[in-house]
Amino acid sequence: MSTLQDFQIAPAILHRVTVRDASAILFCTLLTVFLFISQGTVRGVKRVGKSRLRTLVTGETPLRFDLEKYGYLGYQQFSKKANKPFLVKIYGLDHYVLPVKYLDSLKTVDHHRLSFAQSLNDFLNVDASLGDLVTHSDMEIAVVTKHLNPRLTTLTPVLVDEANFAFEKELGKLETWKTVNALFLSAFLTNRTSGRVLVGDLCRDDNYLHAMMKYTESVFSSGVAFNGIPLGPFRKIVYYLGARQHRRDLDNAAALVLPEIKRRMAAQAEDPNCRKENDAIQWNLDLPLASPKEGLPLRHAHRVLHLSFAATGTVAILITHMIYNVLMYPEYLEPLREEVMACTKAHGGWTEKAMNEMWKLDSFIRETLRVQPPSVFTAYRTVKNQPFTFPDGFTLPVGSRITFPTLPVGLDPENYESASEFDGFRFFRKREEARLAKKAYNWGATKIDSSFLPFGYGNQACPGRFFGVRKTKILFGKLINDYDFSWAEPRSARPENIVIEGQILVNPTPEIKIKSRVAAGM
């Protein structure tokens, strides 16, 4: 339905109104059209979805909760059939959803032309709480690429140690069945384990843990709260006013990080050769400053907390998806356990070599991401500084937002055999085939290609995926090795996901029964 059709007014009403009334109606109609209709879209690109007014009038599911459906429709009708973009509102903003033929441009074009940070800032309204933190510099990315990723091998024992503490703290030795919420368990395990690398010893301070989790949980809810309202030019001010509680959560968490940041800054000022910790707080302090304000203690605190948001939420959701999958497909549980036990026994525990040989677990992670990716769409970018032209001549004006159809691509039968079915060892078999044929294996859980986009694509793909997959292996591997678990209540179907603004969120309500395994070996 055309958006203009949503604003038709019955002639029977019009002939009874005065000139003043008509002027008021005309003004309100024009204002509403201004707010409801996107400006400056590229001619010839078709829109999918439904207007906000239509869903209000008809009672249909609003588009922001129905993007899985319209992502598929647009993919089939435009991306696949015509190899063309389509337009859809995501996060209340127009996005061009591009066919995969345009992915290669993301490999070479830098963030000054096509910016993921600008997209993130705009669709989650990050500036309502953190100002220009994610757009002013790439220091947050540099913490991951220049410090975290090169240290992952040496950080493995640290992660394992903290995972052991997290399991002891959250579960301990359970001789009888205990009922827990699956997502809450995953979230606490993930946040405790991640925290050791992000904030060092502060991770074991429960006051900090709860304050940080309250902040990270409100990033998404605060960032999308008003997207169902056509705010137009008032979007930023409305989100700023609406984010007061979120900013309070941020302040509370920052107040617990700031003393440690200030202590270290003072120690380094007194003695540049002083002992340094091996965590994200220190890596922030060691980075060259993009500008003087990036060196302020509060700015460092905000960067650490935003990194915590990025490092924990998606991993907790992924682990919960994996719990649901292994309960719905129990035939995978024992082979996964056997692999974990064999690898840890052969290599003396959760070592780098042990994890590198957990091929079935790696496959299970990748298949979960294929079927239940973090979002219907990924590889978001915003055109900056000047119009951007793709190799085939398709041109987008400055300010245009693009993305790619991750879930439809992952479930496309042209990309995967029996694509709609969950096959936990799909990529393990590919690995075995490659090994027997003496060919390179390109289907590891962190490997990105044009048919696997959960981590984005190109030179701004998720740099934290290596850290995320490593934590997932440790936490899920220890969970299945050390504990038995089942649904708290019998289920015949997998809990339905919740999709908001294209984000695929795990159903937060299911509970599981859990107890220690008698045969647990590690």
Curated annotation (Swiss-Prot):
Q: From its record, what is one biological process in GO terms? A: secondary metabolic process
Residues reported in the UniProt entry to bind heme: 462
For this chain, one GO molecular function annotation is: heme binding
User: Do the record's keywords include Glycoprotein?
Assistant: yes
* Location of the protein in the cell: Membrane
**Enzymatic class:** oxidoreductase
EC nos: 1.-.-.-
Keyword Transit peptide applies: no
In the bilayer, the protein is annotated as:
Multi-pass membrane protein
**Required cofactor names:** heme
Residue positions the entry lists as glycosylated:
191
Record-linked PANTHER family:
CYTOCHROME P450 (PTHR46206), P450, PUTATIVE (EUROFUNG)-RELATED (PTHR46206:SF1)
Q: What does this protein do?
A: Cytochrome P450 monooxygenase; part of the gene cluster that mediates the biosynthesis of sirodesmin PL, an epipolythiodioxopiperazine (ETP) characterized by a disulfide bridged cyclic dipeptide and that acts as a phytotoxin which is involved in the blackleg didease of canola. SirD catalyzes the O-prenylation of L-tyrosine (L-Tyr) in the presence of dimethylallyl diphosphate (DMAPP) to yield 4-O-dimethylallyl-L-Tyr, and therefore represents probably the first pathway-specific enzyme in the biosynthesis of sirodesmin PL.
What protein name applies here? Answer: Cytochrome P450 monooxygenase sirB
